[in-house]
Amino acid sequence: MEKETTRPVEVKITEAPRDAMQGIKQYIPVEQQAELINAILKVGFDIVDFGSFVSPKAIPQLKDTADVIKKLDITHSRSKLMAIVGNAKGGEIATDFDEVSLLGYPFSFSETFLKLNINSTLDEAKKTNLL
């Protein structure tokens, strides 16, 4: 039996090169990061999770996100750019870039996840200005 729904369903497709790049140990130069993301922007995903504004100690691969933004061509793309932030400072930096439409915050109830992703405990994460 099919389930009837009276509310509209909307699906947003997100591509996350940031997630892939942050796991690569060998540094990817700004030009190469921008080239990859520009190619993804041409596809037309709803959202492109492209970089992060976190401590370079936490994710060295994405330390140049601000430089990558300057090389992105969003003029003919319908994709919205999303960046990950680990705290209020990262959120403030991200808002300096009009190109960034969405911010993601890696919250979890897992202490291990929080320690690895934002170097925070659950209590500390709950107290941030981002929640």
Locations of the language-model features?
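N-terminal small/glycine-rich loop or linker at the start of catalytic domains
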Residues: 2-25, 102-117
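Active-site beta-loop-alpha junctions enriched in small/polar residues
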Residues: 16-18, 53-55, 84-88, 108-110
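Catalytic domains of carbohydrate-active enzymes, especially glycoside hydrolases
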Residues: 35-51, 95-102
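Glycine-rich, proline-tolerant flexible connector loops at the mouths of alpha/beta enzymes
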Residues: 46-71, 105-120
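Alpha-helix-loop-beta-strand connector modules within alpha/beta enzyme cores
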Residues: 58-83, 124-131
